[in-house]
Amino acid sequence: MAVIGVSTTHDHHPANVIYNKNHLRYPVQTFAVNPKGGQLNRAPVYRSVGQIETAVDLAVIAVRSRFVPDVVAQCIEKGVKGAVIISGGFAETGDKDLQKEVTDLAAQADFPFVGPNCLGIYSPDAVDTFFLPGERIIHPKKGNIGFVSQSGGVLVDQMVKFAGQGIGVSAAVSIGNKACIRETHMIDWFEQDLGTRVIAFYIEGFECREGREFIKRAHTCTKPIVVLKAGKTARGIAAASSHTASVAGDYRVFSQIMAQHCVAEADTEYELTSFCEALSCYPKGSSGHIGIVSLSGGHGVVAADACGHHGLDIPEIAEQ
């Protein structure tokens, strides 16, 4: 893995954080890249990704946005298989042309990338491109939840919630502006991943017709899918646009379509956690007939009301 944009003078630079923790804690060969060259922690800093003699599977790009097209071109020329673009300053701040330049360049070369404006990928025991020091983030254990989020902050907070409930993840991916890799691609990947049983999403919005494609793909997926949809109000829609350049659309329509196509919708981050935990243990639905056993009469009443609210049947118990 090449980490492009490291600093030889500023130890807390995001690229340095990514380089250091992967170099020291994960089984990945890591290379530091900066046009000035030099050394970082007694290891050489390459002036370009092209100078690295070893084949590179992944490039983590953490340079100023205006330099990203040139760096992507260098990665393509080197034969790098894909990238995570951490850098912000693209469509989310109004520079759609710069984002399109990167996207077009990558599309012509069939070069996949995550981002821009994202944290990237966390895969337990494999790789971590989040630019947060270990003491500032709680990593859940390895498990069977695949989580995809447009927001890096929501992803980090959700990882804390998963860890608190003892829920493990197979991988967590922050896709940011999703200029290349999108939700449908992640469904494809997680569906074939043997270590994933549940696929969860935090979604702010879609481009034109993208929501329809997501629902169609989710409906055919063989694994349960849970969605936490943001941008439900006028204020939320405006916030989504400035955050990840997303078009939130009509929430009520999308919510109804999700229900029609068996996509579980969580109203809050806490519901998302509970849904993932339940589906990771019981991925296949029941007939809807529920029996309630409770030491507390009051909790039995609450459970009965919840079943009624969600259309679940509680059969009468036979006298014998």
Give the residues covered by each predicted segment.
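Catalytic-core regions of core metabolic enzymes
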Residues: 1-320
